[in-house]
């Protein structure tokens, strides 16, 4: 308030007027120049990720069709009719003292109650799977937000859902690193770098173990039907374990929905990542000449199991990938190849002796 006012400044020249941008003249390329011309393209990884997210959102979003509404209305009317008829039968049995009919009504009521409870439980678990996609979108918004007050509550909710105890060392380090002056982006980023890797490491170990078991089973077993059943069972078990690690309890329909989303993701992304991560390395090492056909099939099955686990991890994870921390097939490739080679060498050693 006590500082003196600055004196006025007079400019001699006129103000600069914004001029319209000048475009260069049209240039026509001949055939030789056109062959060397390469148009700029979008990042294929970002474009593919956006398309996959759109497919997953469409699959998670319930379809509000007319037939669906008619079926739901018919089921609701049928359920109300069954309840009303059951109440009427119970009253008639009580008035006429027909204890056999009354016992049948009680048994029917227990069966209907168990069925309704199962439907409600399945719906709640399926709703929880859908909420995980919304939580991932919320985390993505918080990672670009400069506000305060929402990041800490959001991260504490994620830790509670995952079953991380308040005395866990990673959570204690996160609490010690945050303070009131940090915005939501910084708080969520600290959680992603300090607490989330604990769950990610456990999921990676599950994926690595399942991929190794699939690889060795295919490489050793001579029965294709047994191999297919084993791989299907191991993949479903892997999805259940990954979902449990990230705090998602799967029911029957939610398990089918998650498995469908994983297969959709893999089919939509195609085999480009598999070829990019594995193809050149296999050609360079000439594994086809070193390993048997069954061993090569085992490595392929193990890599597909690893890819399935990575996609399940991506769908169940509450946070988007940050700083290129997404696991890659190359992380599991060398381990699978080393285990197959070690198994084959152990099998050849006794025969040589």
UniProtKB/Swiss-Prot annotation:
Gene Ontology cellular component terms for the protein in this record: plasma membrane
InterPro entries on file: DUF697 (IPR021147), UPF0283 (IPR006507)
Pfam family for this entry, one: DUF697
Periplasmic side: 1-69, 121-212
Assigned keywords, A-Z: Cell inner membrane, Cell membrane, Membrane, Transmembrane, Transmembrane helix
UniProt topology in membrane: Multi-pass membrane protein
Compartmental location: Cell inner membrane
Membrane-spanning segments: 70-90, 100-120, 213-233
UniProt cross-references to HAMAP family, sorted A to Z: UPF0283
NCBIfam families named among the record's database cross-references: hyp_HI0043 (TIGR01620)
PANTHER family given in the database record: UPF0283 MEMBRANE PROTEIN YCJF
Family named by the database record: Belongs to the UPF0283 family.
UniProt name for this protein: UPF0283 membrane protein YcjF
Organism: Escherichia coli (strain K12)
Biological classification of the source: Bacteria, Pseudomonadati, Pseudomonadota, Gammaproteobacteria, Enterobacterales
Primary gene name: ycjF
């Amino acid at each position: 308030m006590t500082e003196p006012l600055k004196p006025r400044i007079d400019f001699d020249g006129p103000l600069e007027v914004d001029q319209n941008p000048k475009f260069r003249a049209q240039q026509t390329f001949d055939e030789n120049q056109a062959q060397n011309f390469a148009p700029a393209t979008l990042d294929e990884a970002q474009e593919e990720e956006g398309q996959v997210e759109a497919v997953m959102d469409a699959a998670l979003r319930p379809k509000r069709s007319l037939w669906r509404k008619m079926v739901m209305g018919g089921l609701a009317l049928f359920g109300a009719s069954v309840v009303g008829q059951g109440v009427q039968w119970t009253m008639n049995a009580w008035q006429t003292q027909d204890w056999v009919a009354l016992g049948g009504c009680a048994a029917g009521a227990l069966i209907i109650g168990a069925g309704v409870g199962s439907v409600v439980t399945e719906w709640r678990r399926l709703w929880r799977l859908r909420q995980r996609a919304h939580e991932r979108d919320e985390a993505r918004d918080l990672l670009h937000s400069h506000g305060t007050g929402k990041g800490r509550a959001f991260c504490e909710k994620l830790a509670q859902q995952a079953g991380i105890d308040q005395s866990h060392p990673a959570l204690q380090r996160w609490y010690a690193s945050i303070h009131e002056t940090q915005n939501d982006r910084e708080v969520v980023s600290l959680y992603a770098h300090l607490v989330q890797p604990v769950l990610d490491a456990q999921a990676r170990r599950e994926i690595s173990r399942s991929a190794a078991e699939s690889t060795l089973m295919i490489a050793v077993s001579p029965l294709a039907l047994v191999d297919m059943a084993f791989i299907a069972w191991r993949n479903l078990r892997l999805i259940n374990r990954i979902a449990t690690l990230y705090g998602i309890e799967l029911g029957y329909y939610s398990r089918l929905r998650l498995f469908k989303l994983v297969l959709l993701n893999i089919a939509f992304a195609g085999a480009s990542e598999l070829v990019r991560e594995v193809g050149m390395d296999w050609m360079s090492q000439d594994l086809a000449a070193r390993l048997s056909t069954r061993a090569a099939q085992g490595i392929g099955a193990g890599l597909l199991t690893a890819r399935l686990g990575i996609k399940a991890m991506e769908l169940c994870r509450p946070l988007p990938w940050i700083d290129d921390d997404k696991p890659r097939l190359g992380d599991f490739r060398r381990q699978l190849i080393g285990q197959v080679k070690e198994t084959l060498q152990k099998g050849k050693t006794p025969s040589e002796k």
